[in-house]
A protein has these predicted regions:
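Short, charge-patterned binding micro-sites
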Residues: 1-2
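Structured mid-to-C-terminal alpha-helical surface segments
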Residues: 5, 10-185
Length: 185
């Protein structure tokens, strides 16, 4: 649900040349407000007068052996359909858990709860990881809910999360604790 698109490279490439070609293609229809190669990713940010928010495209530079499947990308606003190699939802959930533990970004919690509500299970996690997740979620403050999460949500949904937090995600983490094993060195 985030207002960004995340991609991963699947084979080595000339990143500078790729960024030049991608920027050139996007500038035909969008204002490119940022385009650079960062330490971990190739980053582009776009805007258009047709949509009120900017779109961030992030292409991770590390090649990983993720669980993927071919999906059809489509939009109700266009007739073009494009096949993509996409992470499975289970892989996406694993990545979101890992990302939240790495960067403590509230949008990762929103994405985890969103997927849980649509039937994607949490990956198997040991008790120490579950405790870290729960503690970090509890540490999220009002500013994160109102500003960071609020900037990507509509008002009615924002009000629910501001008042209840990640109640459903916390419930699922609590359930997972009941069957989790302690990690032993």
């Amino acid at each position: 649900y985030s207002v960004d698109l995340d991609f991963w490279v699947i084979k080595p490439m000339d990143e500078e040349a790729y960024l030049v070609r991608l920027r050139s293609a996007l500038e035909k229809d969008y204002e490119v407000t940022d385009a650079e190669i960062k330490y971990h990713s190739i980053l582009l940010e776009l805007r258009t007068h047709r949509y009120p928010r900017r779109l961030k495209i992030e292409i991770r530079r590390t090649i990983e052996d993720w669980d993927r499947q071919v999906k059809i990308a489509f939009s109700r606003h266009a007739t073009l359909q494009v096949p993509l190699k996409a992470h499975t939802l289970e892989q996406t959930m694993k990545n979101k858990v890992s990302a939240f533990l790495d960067r403590n970004e509230i949008r990762d919690c929103f994405d985890m709860e969103f997927m849980l509500r649509r039937g994607v299970s949490l990956p198997p996690l040991d008790a120490s990881v579950l405790r870290r997740l729960r503690a970090r979620i509890q540490d999220l403050g009002e500013k994160e809910f109102k500003v960071k999460l609020g900037s990507v949500l509509e008002n009615d949904i924002r009000a629910v999360y501001t008042s209840r937090g990640f109640a459903y995600l916390n419930e699922k983490l609590h359930e997972a604790m009941a069957t989790a094993k302690e990690e032993h060195p």
